[in-house]
Regions:
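Strand-loop microenvironment adjacent to phosphate/nucleotide-handling motifs in alpha/beta enzyme folds
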Residues: 280, 285-289, 441-457, 462-616
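N-terminal Rossmann NAD(P)H-binding glycine-rich loop of SDR-like oxidoreductase domains
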Residues: 295-313
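Conserved Rossmann-fold cofactor-binding substructure of NAD(P)-dependent oxidoreductases
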Residues: 350-370
Length: 616
């Protein structure tokens, strides 16, 4: 097979999903067994007769038992680039046990097989099953080397605890491009000891000196619980001496087989330096809320909407409706999800939330159990310039979704709000505050349950400052912040999405749910950490203040004092109770807004939002 053909086959197999890989390897396995039974027959009897039914039954039983065993061991789709000797041993035992079980069953009815025949069959089958897998690894490894990826890089591992031990268990596999020369750990008792065959050379502080002595090119952090300040210190040392710094995937992802310990390295990102650990919530009651049901997400192509779709799909709903206005973003999330979750029915729907009739038609057709309303305009300065669009999308759009939920008798609606809805000085925050009023207004009148979810800035979302900083750093700076005093609450996209899903499970009576996001972060500190992550210093990439933009606040709030309640639905999730306004009054106010334009509309919405926030 020439190089082009080899590359073609590798690329073809690499894009297969889990189910398709099972079929791919299953084809090789059954072919190996058929060939083994034929060869064994020829060697024992010296000729080929038409295959007796006995041998067909024996081969079929062996294949069924074998598939059950390797499926139990999780090997039916995983034998590829990251296989270990233990995986190959399991295949041998799987073939052996399956063959013996089939022999016992067949011998009771068809005493035609000798023990020598079965032994030969086991050896031939094991050889033929392992041959394509080992060949696959060798070809893939050689291809990596041909692409310049296979050069061994001298590497330090940071962490001699559980994470380091898990790393070492998978270190010696054929596609690794690492040459591990030492381990660093701050536990003095571990210095001089070995993890596997690799010595613990010293502490983190010894990194610059030891890296120079051992000519190290790369550092891998294998401590999932490492304090953010320690991450930052290690990163500063690596930047100073020109080392690349990576982290091992989360232990949970490695244990569950989502990512390999080797080859799944990630660069240290901003979430590692934020000063708090990512919040994970109790998911015990989400299965009954989602499993087997139809879920609809508006704004499904956006940063939050798409992550809600991913998180919801983990709980095996029957169907997920991906509703959005942008065809390209819906197309992308649709094709991502159908690859990852083949058993779920994903339905892409192009629709505008400003079109009530279209929404009602979709809701009545698919009968969702929960609607997650993520579609909204979120950019503060942009909405200051376009207040009419903020009104149409965030207020009218939310009203249409809530009204369609009521009319179609959808059991629950969860609306995504923002901390900018609290005491809003800008039109974006004000429209989201009015959207909260719409949700609570419908909750008072409808048989459906409505709730809202407030959270702060979402790291990595389209409206986040992170992509802006990344672009400015890539262009050589400067990095611009509006005011060095400005602070914001931050959370990750998965955190925000999990909160939204939990809100749906705990919603009862028009609540506003808020996640404990820790302390607010100075935007200036965030910018400094981003520069550090890029491998530069502030002398190379300066950070400058440009002044507060229209509609921005120095500080954000999550609740005003009148919205606080005493209870928590669960750890890290607080409940607020917003002032409720009769839906008839909201209808009247919306009609007034329809007649306004520009600055008049902006002032009216902001004034109304603040009046309702502080009303008794």
């Amino acid at each position: 097979m020439n190089k082009k053909m080899t590359d073609y086959v590798i690329d073809l197999v690499e894009v297969l999903n889990k189910q398709q890989k099972q079929i791919f390897w299953g084809f090789f396995d059954i072919a190996s067994m058929v060939l083994s039974i034929i060869v064994s027959y020829i060697l024992f009897y010296g000729l080929i007769n038409p295959a007796p039914v006995d041998y067909v039954i024996y081969t079929g039983l062996t294949f069924i038992f074998y598939q059950i065993m390797i499926g139990f061991w999780g090997l039916n789709a995983s034998i590829s680039r990251y296989s270990k000797i233990t995986d190959f041993m399991k295949i041998f035992f799987g073939v052996t046990i399956s063959s013996i079980l089939s022999y016992i069953i067949c011998y009771a009815f068809l005493p035609l097989f000798s023990v020598r025949f079965i032994v030969l069959f086991i050896l031939l089958t094991t050889f033929l099953i392992l041959l394509p897998r080992i060949t696959w690894q060798l070809i893939y490894s050689r291809r990596k080397k041909g692409n310049g990826e296979g050069e061994h890089r001298r590497t330090f591992l940071i962490g001699a605890g559980d994470g380091g031990a898990l790393f070492m268990n998978s270190y010696q596999h054929p596609t690794s491009d690492l040459e591990l020369v030492g381990i660093l750990d701050n536990d003095e008792k571990k210095k001089g000891q070995k993890l596997g065959k690799i010595p613990v050379l010293g502490s983190y502080d010894d990194l610059p000196e030891l890296a120079k002595r051992f000519r190290v090119e790369k550092v891998i952090v294998a401590i999932p619980s490492l304090d953010p300040s320690e991450y930052e210190r290690i990163l500063q040392m690596c930047n100073h001496i020109g080392l690349k710094c990576y982290k091992m995937p989360m232990i949970e992802s490695v244990v569950q087989g989502i990512q390999p310990p080797i080859g799944g390295f990630q660069k240290i990102d901003i979430t590692d330096l934020l000063g708090r650990k990512e919040i994970r919530l109790d998911e015990s009651r989400l299965g009954s809320e989602i499993t087997g049901k139809t879920i609809l997400v508006t704004g499904a192509g956006g940063s939050i909407g798409s992550e809600i779709c991913r998180q919801v799909s983990r709980f095996n709903p029957e169907r997920v409706i991906l509703l959005g206005h942008g065809e390209n973003s819906i197309y992308l999330i649709y094709h991502e999800l159908i690859r990852k979750f083949q058993e779920i029915d994903f339905v892409p729907v192009i629709a505008d939330i400003q079109d009530y009739d279209r929404l009602l038609q979709v809701f009545e057709q698919y009968e969702p159990a929960i609607v997650y309303h993520a579609a909204a305009h979120k950019h503060v300065p942009m909405m200051e310039r376009n207040p009419k669009e903020a009104f149409k999308n965030n207020i009218l759009g939310t009203y249409n979704v809530a009204r369609a939920v009521d009319a179609a008798r959808v059991p629950k609606m969860v609306m995504i709000s923002t901390d900018k809805a609290v005491n809003p000085p800008n039109v974006m925050g004000a429209t989201k505050r009015v959207a909260e009023l719409i949700v609570t207004g419908f909750n008072q009148r409808s048989q459906s349950t409505y709730c809202a979810v407030r959270f702060g800035n979402v790291l990595g979302s389209r409206g986040s400052v992170i992509p802006v900083f990344e672009r400015q750093i890539a262009e050589g700076g400067p990095v611009t912040v509006t005011d060095f005093r400005m602070t914001r609450y931050f959370m990750t996209i998965p955190e925000a999405s999990r909160l939204v899903i939990h809100a749906g499970a705990y919603a009862k009576d028009g609540e506003v749910f808020i996640l404990d996001m820790g302390k607010p972060v100075r935007i200036y500190d965030l910018a400094k950490k981003m520069v550090l992550l890029s491998g530069h210093t502030e002398n190379e990439i300066p950070i400058v203040g440009v002044g507060i933009r229209p509609g921005e606040k120095l500080y954000e709030e999550l609740l005003v004092s009148t919205e606080l309640v005493d209870n928590q639905v669960m750890d890290k999730i607080f409940v607020g109770k917003v002032n409720v306004m009769p839906l008839e009054m909201i209808d009247q106010k919306i009609e007034e807004f329809r007649t306004m334009q520009g600055s008049e509309l902006k002032r009216a919405i902001i004034s109304f939002a603040n009046e309702t926030t502080h009303a008794d």
